[in-house]
């Protein structure tokens, strides 16, 4: 059964608002283009009404911070299962988009804009052509689903096909209309599927059991703190923190600062927790991280926001180096996902090379 949601007017006698309908799918699309946060604050729209070459048009195309693409199909009424087949067909087109083709799509959408400049401005990082469109996800935006469609989507997502549904409902409030929306599946889980299936175009191989971790340093995050106190962390939104849930005690992680290079290898000790729950082992005993870390003042600013707060995974370091001695060579794997399970041959080469540089990796 599709997710149902209602808005109530608060008062001595609460009153539920009556439902309404949008005039057209075009109206919904126009709203999303004007305010992409209706879908996600962590994506950037790059295309609209693009011809697939398969006799159809995709409604919207977005890009995530790791360079993966998001195919978005809009349906204002009940969505039959045939729409899933259509979306999968469109996804086959998205999968084969080249860097040049994606840049052209964005140029049309932005009236001549530069994709790499827009990406840098939006996400604060350089767009890596090697990781652009390594993976993608499908999002259906619909008022409701029939039961068959819902079963199909759950089946696909459970098997690591990154597909989700954003249910929306329109309510009438006097002369105004209000839009409510809710995800069928936690979007972080879908992103975790994207990270799990990330692969280089073309050749791939079974995952080797070694985890890649992106640890971006800055005003809210210090490698020297992480190295000294034994942790990795991420924050700023569910897109960045959700993949930390892929890690379990005993997993081995190879940690890279994308702007610097590889900094260390360690084993996971505890599952992910928020900054308010994470403690630091000091000479004076166990203390809250917010009382110890050098970046604590910045971390406190978002500590009570469950979406934006920093999240931590405790790690036992096996071997580390300072930032000025980071391992950064041509041909080593890199990715913007906080955690992923790469299946590219480059990852096998990277781990083999790193084992030569971080010699205590097996301790």
Q: What is the predicted role of each segment?
A:
Residues 56, 68, 262, 309-311:
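Residues at beta-strand starts and edge strands
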Residues 246, 262, 275-276:
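Short, Lys/Arg-enriched phosphate-binding patches
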Residues 260-267:
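Short, Lys/Arg- and Gly-enriched loop/turn segments at beta-strand edges
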Residues 213-216, 254, 315:
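A short beta-strand micro-motif
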Residues 249-253:
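Loop/turn positions that initiate beta-strands
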Residues 1-231, 238-248, 321, 330-348, ...:
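Charged, terminal alpha-helix-loop-beta segments
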Residues 267-345:
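Aromatic- and Lys/Arg-enriched surface recognition patch
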């Amino acid at each position: 059964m599709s997710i149902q949601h209602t808005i109530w007017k608060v008062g001595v006698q609460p009153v539920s608002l009556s439902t309404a309908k949008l005039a057209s799918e075009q109206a919904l699309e126009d709203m999303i283009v004007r305010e992409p946060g209706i879908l996600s604050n962590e994506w950037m729209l790059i295309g609209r009404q693009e011809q697939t070459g398969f006799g159809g048009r995709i409604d919207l195309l977005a890009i995530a911070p790791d360079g993966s693409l998001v195919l978005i199909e809009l349906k204002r009424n009940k969505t039959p299962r045939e729409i899933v087949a259509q979306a999968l067909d469109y996804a086959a087109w998205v999968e084969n988009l080249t860097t040049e083709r994606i840049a052209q799509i964005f140029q049309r959408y932005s009236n001549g804009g530069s994709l790499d400049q827009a990406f840098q401005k939006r996400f604060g990082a350089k767009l890596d052509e090697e990781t652009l469109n390594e993976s993608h996800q499908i999002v259906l935006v619909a008022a409701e689903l029939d039961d068959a469609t819902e079963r199909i989507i759950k089946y696909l997502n459970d098997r690591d096909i990154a597909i989700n549904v954003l249910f929306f409902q329109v309510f009438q409030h006097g002369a105004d209309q209000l839009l409510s929306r809710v995800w069928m599946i936690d979007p972080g889980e879908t992103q975790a599927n994207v990270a799990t299936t990330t692969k280089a175009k073309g050749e791939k191989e079974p995952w080797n059991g070694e985890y890649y971790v992106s640890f971006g340093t800055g005003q809210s995050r210090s490698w020297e703190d992480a190295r000294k106190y034994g942790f990795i962390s991420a924050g700023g939104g569910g897109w960045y923190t959700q993949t930390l849930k892929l890690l379990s005690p005993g997993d081995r992680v190879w940690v890279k600062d994308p702007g610097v290079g590889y900094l260390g290898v360690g084993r996971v000790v505890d599952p992910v927790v928020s900054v308010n729950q994470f403690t630091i082992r000091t000479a004076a005993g166990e203390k809250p991280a917010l009382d110890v870390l050098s970046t604590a003042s910045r971390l406190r600013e978002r500590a009570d926001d469950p979406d934006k707060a920093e999240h931590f995974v405790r790690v036992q370091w096996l071997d580390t180096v300072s930032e000025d001695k980071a391992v950064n060579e041509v041909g080593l794997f890199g990715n913007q996902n906080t955690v992923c399970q790469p299946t590219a041959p480059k990852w096998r080469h990277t781990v083999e090379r790193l084992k030569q540089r971080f010699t205590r990796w097996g301790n």
